[in-house]
Amino acid sequence: MTATAGRVLRQLTHDPRTIALLVIVPVLLITLLRYVFDGAPGTFDATGASLLGIFPLITMFLVTSIATLRERTTGTLERLLALPLGKGGLIAGYALAFGAVAVVQSALATAVSVWLLGLDVVGSPWLLLLVALLDALLGTALGLFVSAFAASEFQAVQFMPAVIFPQLLLCGLFTPREAMHPVLEAISNVLPMSYAVDGMNQVLQHPDITGDFVRDVAVVAGSALLVLCLGAITLRSRTP
């Protein structure tokens, strides 16, 4: 598992464009958002915390799904699965590697948002970092899972409108979930991104850890673990 993680990390260090997408792009997007709302800092506070979790989720989803698919199309996965490692260990290795990147990504985005851009949070910035990290890990898990159903990198990207966009629309970022049509609200209640946004809002509004925050974090973490298990089950050694 650690050998797989080390190999993936070494590959990433030789791909500066991917590193830029993972680490720099979320920071640039948060910075852009701050100056879009330059005349309304309260609006940045209200949306910035939520997007601090959403941006890492999206970037990790894209990079993980494409990177895993590339491993399969080049025959690397087939060779690795011939070893005694097993699918579960292989997925755990990928998750460990991209999880390490997620730590750097989330820490940098949180630090820039809070201490440089002035994101006003009532709770601890460390809790903000925790939710951002779990969101990035969820994006990693989703990327590993959907890569099993794509035959090309283009198809991997096509999963984004199906997997990410509905969650983005229903997570409560644009309107409170309780104000949605009852059917849409019910759907949003089972989508992990909804709890990611709720968790960020809990840190934004409350100085202490609340029961709702614990629930939100547990749902996001549990969803990531569940999707990782599904990814191990559906992992293919060859392109379908």
Predicted regions located by residue number:
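Membrane-interacting alpha-helical segments
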Residues: T2, G6-T13, R17, Q167, ...
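Transmembrane helix-boundary elements of multi-pass transport/secretion proteins
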Residues: A3-E78, K87-A107, S113, L117-A132, ...
